[in-house]
Amino acid sequence: MQYNFKVEAFEGPLDLLLHLIHRYEIDIYNIPVAEITEQYLSYVHTMKELQLDVASEYLVMAATLLQIKSKMLLPKHEEDVLDNGDDFIDDPRQELMERLIEYKKYKQVATELKEREQERAQLYTRPPIDFTSLQQEEETSLPLDVTLYDMLAAFQKLMRRKKAKKPVTTRITRQEIPIEQRMTDILKLLEIQGGRQSFYDLFVDDEREIMVVTFLAVLELMKNQQIVIEQEHNFDEIFVSSYTKSA
């Protein structure tokens, strides 16, 4: 089965690296290259396995990380270190670190500009505020913004869990299910469950092809703003809610 699925929200390899740095609380000035390379390659492999449209720059970054990793493994000769003991300039990670810091600044500025634009729009469009309900909203713990990279991590975890539960010998039967049909099934399930369901509970079938179709259906429903993905804290369980339920 071939599903060529393009997701515009994947912003590029630097965005993925920043996501990994944030997710695993890594110091951007002292990146553990071996660890970050392993995580990065795992994400790219999952994206390709799902037949998402992986841009060539992801593969270029993968090659760059592997090159940096190999340089980090080389023995460092004393003559390569500066006389003052500062070997920061010779650090193979230097260029990547500078690119990440620059990209992080760009993202922060873009986010601030977007927030200001939304605030200006609300000045002219929002109705009078009921301050009694506002106080209640402020006391409520808001869910985290769940990115597509978080969804990939959840799918990776799901695949590992399903693989561990599978018996040694399994009979494989191929079932071709259109993404549109699986989207309809998910929306019906949410309606039955009161508008909210655990992400993992959507994957009742252990067959890989059906799991892939289910995941792509979730992405398509997110893209169409028919469902909302919620997570209270980092690494917590992910829930899928119908858009009307979360509104």
Curated annotation (Swiss-Prot):
Chain coiled-coil ranges: none
Organism: Bacillus cereus (strain AH187)
Family of this protein: Belongs to the ScpA family.
Glycoprotein keyword on record: no
The protein, known as: Segregation and condensation protein A
Localization annotation: Cytoplasm
Function in brief: Participates in chromosomal partition during cell division. May act via the formation of a condensin-like complex containing Smc and ScpB that pull DNA away from mid-cell into both cell halves.
Keyword annotations: Cell cycle, Cell division, Chromosome partition, Cytoplasm
Domain of life: Bacteria
Quaternary state and interactors: Component of a cohesin-like complex composed of ScpA, ScpB and the Smc homodimer, in which ScpA and ScpB bind to the head domain of Smc. The presence of the three proteins is required for the association of the complex with DNA.
Any GO CC annotation of this UniProt entry: cytoplasm
Record GO biological process: cell division; chromosome segregation; DNA replication
